[in-house]
């Protein structure tokens, strides 16, 4: 393993979980960048020639925009979907009510409806501003069945596109890097960082309007360390009030913890799991109800008598003081841990010198992937043993949660389970999440 002094720390991959790579065909058009290894290879982290023609003059990005993630569907709302949604009643007090039915976590048609109603509306975290802090940098990712590409052009403007070539639908770029343009690996079509079609190979004898073949754009905004995208074409770009548009009235509370210039990205860990994305969210929001039973080491770090959960519009904030008796004398959490879950699938955590973000990406009715990004205060960046142990502890917690979530998913698939009950008030965060889901899906 390389020493910390010689190791280059960078974003090793993106939410899509694709390894950093580029097609060799791109070499003739693009600036190259060396993608470094991750912080610790011992930690179980999932990393993720055409003849060209003349430049097509005055090409601009295409104005053709799909209306939603499920752009092939006029609507995903069917009588069956309505029935499934209304099997949960948010008006019934949680103490007396039942949890959503198992079909919320297993039905393929409801999953398609979620992509349309939840993930194609409003802002979603796509990546981090450090990934595109320099001109010509880019990163890629996925959200449901949408592949996206975010870049900063040579003039410093940030763009976001569907990461799909407009010729024959090939995925255009992979991973992260730095390029002066994007070259399709299939037929060598070349697109500028503004999405315009610059070159189309072997088209000398054809006439077509390049304006209709630029990359399909997405709304994009930067809020502090976060790069946000939206598939919803209604409204403004939201670059000034995007925090309030995304989170609501508690944007300042999240900003207070996440906007810290002393923090530096240090590592990414990925955890694919065979469960519905909402199973993980439910698990995250149970106010540590499961922690004493499933996470022995983590439980020893916490003072459960101080645990507090606040419901704030689209955010559920959990706070807990750390235990005075640190396991083996190792202090990872500092005096208090702060966990902010942002509807529908993102969390910001602050504890000790750390910030971690959690992104749970839906991949299907019974499949999702958790991406955990670690940020550390600059003063601790040279303490390699502390860094490795802290990441190992937190990664082990996520691995334990993967086992739990996959077990729950198997149980949801059985005929024995229909709905459950809430244990209040400890599961009020879960109920709040379910009420938001019902409102959005309805």
Swiss-Prot record:
Feature: transit peptide: 1-58
The protein's required cofactors:
[2Fe-2S] cluster; Fe cation; Mg(2+)
Q: Which InterPro entries match?
A: Rieske_2Fe-2S, Rieske_2Fe-2S_sf, Ring_hydroxy_dOase_asu_C_dom, Rng_hydr_dOase-A
Compartments where located: Plastid, Chloroplast stroma
According to its UniProt record, the EC number is 1.14.15.7
Q: Does the keyword Transit peptide apply?
A: yes
Keyword annotations: 2Fe-2S, Chloroplast, Iron, Iron-sulfur, Magnesium, Metal-binding, Monooxygenase, Oxidoreductase, Plastid, Stress response, Transit peptide
Gene Ontology molecular function terms on file:
2 iron, 2 sulfur cluster binding; choline monooxygenase activity; iron ion binding
Listed under GO biological process in this entry are: glycine betaine biosynthetic process from choline
Quote the cofactor binding remark: Binds 1 [2Fe-2S] cluster. Binds 1 Fe cation.
Describe the location of the Rieske domain by residue ranges. Answer: 123-229
Name the PROSITE patterns for this protein. Answer: RIESKE
Q: Which residues bind [2Fe-2S] cluster?
A: 165, 167, 184, 187
Note the Pfam families from the entry. Answer: Rieske, Ring_hydroxyl_A
| Top-level taxon of origin | Eukaryota
- Substrates-to-products reaction catalysed: choline + 2 reduced [2Fe-2S]-[ferredoxin] + O2 + 2 H(+) = betaine aldehyde hydrate + 2 oxidized [2Fe-2S]-[ferredoxin] + H2O
Enumerate the residues binding Fe cation.
290, 295
**GO cellular-component terms in the record?**
chloroplast stroma
Q: What induces it?
A: By salt, drought and heat stress.
Its function, per the record, reads: Catalyzes the first step of the osmoprotectant glycine betaine synthesis.
Instruction: List the PANTHER family hit by this protein, alphabetically.
Output: CHOLINE MONOOXYGENASE, CHLOROPLASTIC
Hey, which family's this protein in?
Belongs to the choline monooxygenase family.
- Protein name according to UniProt: Choline monooxygenase, chloroplastic
> Source species, please?
Amaranthus tricolor
